[in-house]
Amino acid sequence: MSNQRDPRYDVLFEPVKIGPVTAPNRFYQVPHCNGMGRMFPDSMIAMRGMKAEGGWGIVTTEQCDFHPTGDVQPFTETSMWDDGDLPYLAAMVDAVHEHGALAGIELVHNGQDSGCLYSREVPIGPEHRPVTWHQHPIQARAMSRGDIRDYRRWHRKAVLRAREAGFDMVVVYAGHDGTVPSHFLSRQSNQRSDEYGGSLENRLRLYRELIEET
C-alpha cells in the first residue's frame, strides 16, 4: 500500500502568510476549552506544546477572559486580568514556538453571561438583564458610553499583554452569543437607542472599534 499523499491536499501543508506572520501550514487549532486553563497551567502548556509538536501550524488558547467583570467561574479557562497572568501564558507560547508553530490567543469577555462568582463584580452588557448562564439571581448592568470606553481600554491593554507574552495572533472573538461583541450584535440582547444600537451598522460599531484598535 502506498503512503503517498493525495496531491489534492498538498496545499494544506504549504506555508500561509497571515498579515505580518507566516504559519508553517494550513492546520489551525481552533480555540477550545479543556478544563485546565489557569487552574492547571502546567497541563495546559504541555497539551498545547504537544499539538505544535504533532504538526499543527497555529495553536490557540481556549477563551481567555481579560477583565474581572468577565469572570465565568466556576468554568475553568485562561485569564489575563493583570501582569500576574503573563508567566504561564508566556510559557505556553514558548512550548508552541519550540516546535515551529504560531501561538494565538482568544480574548473574551462574557459580558451579561458572566456570573462573577470569584471577582464579585457586577456583570455588564448592552442593557439591564438577568445573567443567563448561572443559577444565581444576578443582574447585568447596562454599559454607559464610559463603560464602553473602559471596555475598549481593557481590551487594548489585554492585546498589549498578549504581545508581551509573545503571542503571534489575537482572536477578537464575537461568537456563540456569549460575549460582549455578540451581545451588541444581537437584536435580542441589544435594544439600545444610541450609536451602539438599532441599525446593523450601529450594532457592529463596538466590534469594528475593537478590530481597528487591535
Spans of model-derived segments:
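N-terminal amphipathic alpha-helix/helix-capping segment at the start of soluble metabolic enzymes
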Residues: 2-28, 96
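Hydrophobic faces of well-ordered beta-strands that scaffold small-molecule active sites
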Residues: 27-30, 59-61, 103-107, 170-172
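Conserved, mostly hydrophobic/aromatic
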Residues: 29, 51, 55, 96, ...
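Aromatic- and acidic-residue-enriched carbohydrate-binding clefts of CAZyme catalytic domains
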Residues: 66-74, 79-80, 116-143, 181-204
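Alpha-helix-loop-beta-strand connector modules within alpha/beta enzyme cores
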Residues: 76-104, 186-214
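Non-globular sequence segments
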Residues: 94, 102, 108-167
